[in-house]
Amino acid sequence: MRLSQKWARYVVGLSVISGFGAGQPALGQSPKPSAVYLSRARESYQNVWNRYRVPAYGLFSENYPSNQADSLTYMQGGGVKEKAVSFLWPFSGLFSATNVLLKTPSERKTQLRYLDSLVAGMETYRDTNRSPVGYQAYPVQFEKADRYYDDNGLVGIDYMEAYLNTRNPLYLSRAKTVFAFILSGWDDELGGGVTWLEGHRDQKPACSNGMATLTALKLYQGTKDPYYLQWGQKFYNWMHASLLDSTGVYANDRKATGALNRVFYTYNSGSMLEAAVLLYQFTGDKQYLNQAEQLAKDSFVHFAKRPHPAPMAIQIDLPWFVTVLFRGYDALYRVNGDYQYVARIRKSLDYAWQHSRDQYGLVTHSWMPDPKELAKPKWLLDQACIAELYARLSLLEKERETKR
């Protein structure tokens, strides 16, 4: 017998209150934040898996409910129609959430099975027909598609996080292959960097170069090979010199003409914030810590000043973009103990969870309870990042609870 949505939410609420699966609190005690957030991460993750999964292909749909007439705007040229399964970028979002959940001991056994499935899914995007080998935007079994350097950076990060979680050498090998593909796009125009996608030389964006920086640094983290540290520093230095704006945040791209495109998204600063923290940890050079702390402050101030609803701490330009910024705040907290930025994003996320979920338990794009948004299909990436955020918050709160 299928539970009604209202009753299902009631059951979920009981599980949170009781601390089910996350440590039973003593009678009369409220559950600890780490347990609440882990429960929400589990619920979000399982909801995505149940609703978006396309069993025939072992992949996921772009939206739920699936609406194949939808037009996707995040590809070169725009106006691409929704297809049978999702593009690589939203698929990667679920892989990233899995990697974070793997860090929680109680979730490891279950998440290893999900990881196996996601690795198989990731490989359907791998294109071996062109040289060098890289990952294209849509599974090769359906069509030939563009190969984006930022997508490949995400694949590299996902595989390195999976390697750091499991020490499976296959994942390390694949991350190295991805990084070789990214380096094939590096040239000395505009002083270095890579473009957005293979064969298009109109811009060098923060998204491609920021994710390349992190891929290199995570490869160094896993191998201690100075080759990857040197490349991480090279990408970082190019970004810092070429795309850091006078506002203190990172601009979207530099055009082939050399003109700076002063459009600002949260994730472009987030990737560089995490990179600065990693460089500080790897080198001990305090300039990186200083740059990280300044970027954390400037990014929060900048996006808090942008128009946004009162319940949100900053402008939610895209939930996944904010998730990448949160990764940077998370990394910085672990080296300097400054929790203020994490706390403010957490408060916004909690508002979205409590007020802005639709009849299927899926969160709106703006994190606000807008009736039109509540009625619309929800994008896979917007939901996968909710699971990642709550998994990260659960880990952070668990550490804070043990220190009290």
Range-by-range predicted roles:
Residues 102, 106, 163-167, 220-224, ...:
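Short coil/turn linking the two alpha-helices of tandem helical-hairpin repeats
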